[in-house]
Design a protein with these regions (language model features):
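ABC-family P-loop ATPase nucleotide-binding domain
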Residues: 1-22, 295-347
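Short, membrane-interfacial amphipathic segments enriched in basic
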Residues: 9-25, 76-88, 126, 204, ...
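N-terminal signal-anchor/first transmembrane alpha helix
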Residues: 14-62, 137, 215-218, 280-281, ...
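Alpha-helical transmembrane segments of integral membrane proteins
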Residues: 34, 85-301
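Hydrophobic alpha-helical transmembrane segments of membrane transport/permease proteins
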Residues: 41, 49-83, 242-248, 303
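Conserved A-loop
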Residues: 336, 353-356
Length: 360
C-alpha cells in the first residue's frame, strides 16, 4: 500500500456493495416504468434481429414472387405484413432491416464516442487556448445542418451504409464532446480531484478514476437519444439513395421503394415507417427512463450520506470523565465547511473527534 493510499479494505468492500445496491435501485426504477420496459423490450428484439434475424424471419427477404396473386398483397397468414410490388415478404424485410439499423447505430455511435469523449475530456481538463480552439471547431460543426454535412462527406467518401455512418459519427461526435467537456469542467474543481493531484496521481489516472465515472451516467442518457437520431439520419440518407443500395431491405430504402408505389399501393410504406417510428420512440423512452432513474439516485445520495453522518454522530459515545481529566485538548463533533456557491456549503470535515494528552 502506498503512502497516499488511505482507503481501508473494509471501506473498499463497503463502497463496492453500495455501488451494487445503487445499480440495483436504478434497475428497479427502470422496470417499474412501463414505457421504459416497452423501450427495453423493443431494443432487445432489435438486438435479436441483429444477431440472428433468421430466427424471426419466415421468408427470404430478397426472394421475389412475381405471380399476380403475390404482388402488393395485404397482411395474411403466410405474409404477416403483406408483400411489396415485387412479391417480397415485407415482414422478413423489416426484420432483416433491423440488422442494418443496429449495424448503422453501432458504427456511428462507436465513432462518435471514440472521438467526442477524448476531445471533450482534453478540452475540459486543460482549458485555456486548447479549450477555446477545440470548442471553436465543435461549435462551427454543431451549428451546421447535419444532413447537409453528411451528404457532403458521403460525396467525398462514396455512397454506402458504412461511409454514410462514418460521416454521421464524425458529425455527432460534437454532441459528446460538448457534454463531456461540461462535466470535466465541473469535476476538475472538486476537492477530491485536488487531493488526487496532491497525492501524485497522473492526469490519465485522475481522468480514469474520478472524471469518467461522473461522465458515464450523463453519457448513457445521451447515447440512447443519439441512437434514435442516428437511425433517423441513416434512414434519410438511404431514402435519398446515398446510404444503403436502393433495392436493399434498409428501412430508409424501403421507404423509397414504397414512395414509387404510393399511388398504386400506399400500404407498402407502412411497415418500414412503423419500424422507424417505434425504434426512435423506444430509444427516447429508454433515455428518459434512465435519466429519471439516475437523477433520482443522484438527488437521494447526499441525503443518505447526511443521514448516515447524523446517525454516526448520535451514536458516538460522549467523552468520559477520565478523558476529560487527562486530556489537554478534547474535541468532539468537529465540522468544517466552505462556501460552495449555488450547490451549498462544501463539507470537508464531518463529525471528527480527538483528544490530546500530556506527552502526545
Amino acid at each position: 500500500m502506498s503512502a497516499f493510499d488511505t482507503t481501508a479494505p473494509s471501506d473498499t468492500v463497503t463502497a463496492a456493495a453500495g455501488s451494487k445496491r445503487g445499480r440495483g435501485r436504478i434497475w428497479r426504477r427502470l422496470l417499474r416504468n412501463p414505457l421504459t420496459v416497452f423501450g427495453l423490450l423493443w431494443i432487445a428484439l432489435l438486438l435479436v434481429c441483429f444477431v440472428a434475424p433468421w430466427l424471426l424471419a419466415n421468408h427470404d427477404p430478397v426472394r421475389q414472387d412475381v405471380s399476380l396473386t403475390r404482388l402488393r398483397e395485404l397482411p395474411s397468414g403466410e405474409h404477416w405484413l403483406g408483400t411489396d410490388a415485387y412479391g417480397r415478404d415485407l415482414y422478413s424485410r423489416v426484420v432483416w432491416g433491423g440488422r442494418l439499423a443496429i449495424k448503422a447505430i453501432l458504427i456511428a455511435l462507436g465513432l462518435a464516442t471514440a472521438i467526442g469523449i477524448p476531445v471533450g475530456l482534453l478540452s475540459g481538463w486543460r482549458g485555456g487556448r486548447i479549450d477555446r480552439a477545440i470548442m471553436w471547431v465543435v461549435d462551427v460543426l454543431f451549428s451546421l445542418p447535419l444532413i447537409l454535412l453528411a451528404l457532403a462527406i458521403v460525396g467525398a467518401l462514396g455512397t454506402g451504409l458504412v461511409p454514410a455512418m462514418i460521416a454521421v459519427g464524425v458529425l455527432l461526435s460534437t454532441r459528446f464532446a460538448r457534454l463531456t467537456r461540461g462535466v470535466a469542467l465541473a469535476e476538475r474543481e472538486e476537492l477530491y480531484v485536488d487531493a488526487a493531484r496532491i497525492s501524485g496521481l497522473s492526469t490519465a489516472a485522475i481522468l480514469r478514476r474520478y472524471i469518467l465515472p461522473n461522465v458515464w451516467p450523463v453519457l448513457i442518457v445521451q447515447i440512447s437519444i443519439i441512437s434514435g437520431v442516428i437511425l433517423l439520419v441513416g434512414a434519410v440518407l438511404s431514402f435519398l439513395g446515398v446510404g444503403s443500395p436502393p433495392d436493399s431491405y434498409d428501412w430508409g430504402a424501403m421507404l423509397n421503394q414504397g414512395r414509387e408505389q404510393v399511388l398504386a399501393f400506399p400500404y407498402q410504406v407502412v411497415p418500414s415507417a412503423a419500424a422507424i417510428v417505434l425504434t426512435v420512440l423506444a430509444f427516447n423512452l429508454v433515455g428518459d427512463g434512465v435519466r429519471d432513474a439516475i437523477g433520482h439516485s443522484s438527488a437521494a445520495a447526499p441525503r443518505r450520506r447526511g443521514e448516515r453522518a447524523e446517525r454516526a454522530r448520535r451514536a458516538e459515545p460522549a467523552p468520559t470523565g477520565e478523558h476529560a481529566e487527562d486530556a489537554l485538548l478534547s474535541v468532539r463533533g468537529l465540522t468544517v465547511e466552505f462556501p460552495g456557491g449555488d450547490r451549498g456549503p462544501a463539507r470537508v470535515v464531518d463529525g471528527v473527534g480527538f483528544a490530546v494528552r500530556r506527552g502526545e
